[in-house]
Regions:
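Preference for intrinsically disordered or flexible, low-complexity segments
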Residues: 4-184
Length: 184
């Protein structure tokens, strides 16, 4: 492993290196290379590797080797767990990109990956009420949909690391911000 190797970019998780990796020297369980970045987010698989590097996540090797997912297929907005429901309108390749080649994010409850413009959004990170002030009009409908009577209260009490966390997304097509509220 060449330490000067370019880190892979995760277009659906642009802040992955701050949020989902830690600087730990070790050997990747998947590729066997000495690495300095270890994934510390969710990975749903039978066998739990101790050390996954960003390269094995980005090229799909980690998901394939361990038959795992970083985000569950049905946790992507627009995908129904019910086989009787119509199939998702989002392209299968984009759904696989989220499940198999994009780092997940840690949450209290099962993580949810929001969509917009017929594609998965980019996860920007965790947001508190102050982070959301400039984009309140954009994200209020998402909160109101889940908490019709308490939307303003919820928005006022969101924090980056408390019991009510805002998970902020942005559409890669139109730039619209979306918000999922994760409850501890």
């Amino acid at each position: 492993g060449d330490p000067r190797m370019e880190r892979p970019l995760f277009i659906h998780h642009p802040n992955a290196y701050t949020l989902s990796f830690e600087e730990v020297v070790g050997v990747c369980d998947c590729c066997g290379q000495p690495r300095a970045l270890r994934y510390r987010g969710p990975f749903y698989s039978v066998l739990s590797p101790d050390y996954l590097c960003p390269w094995c996540i980005a090229d799909g090797r980690a998901a394939a080797s361990y038959e795992g997912e970083f985000t569950g297929w049905c946790d992507i907005e627009g995908v129904s767990p019910d086989p009787a429901d119509p199939p998702p309108t989002i392209a299968r390749e984009l759904l696989l990109e989220i499940c198999e080649r994009t780092p997940g994010y840690s949450s209290w409850q099962q993580s949810v990956w929001l969509s917009h413009c017929e594609r998965p959004c980019a996860f920007l990170g965790f947001a508190g009420n102050e982070d959301l002030l400039p984009i309140l009009d954009q994200v209020r409908p998402d909160v109101a949909a889940v908490n019709p009577r308490d939307a303003d209260w919820v928005l006022a009490h969101l924090s980056r690391d408390g019991m009510m966390v805002g998970c902020l997304f942005q559409c890669l097509e139109c730039g619209q911000h979306r918000l999922h509220v994760d409850l501890g």
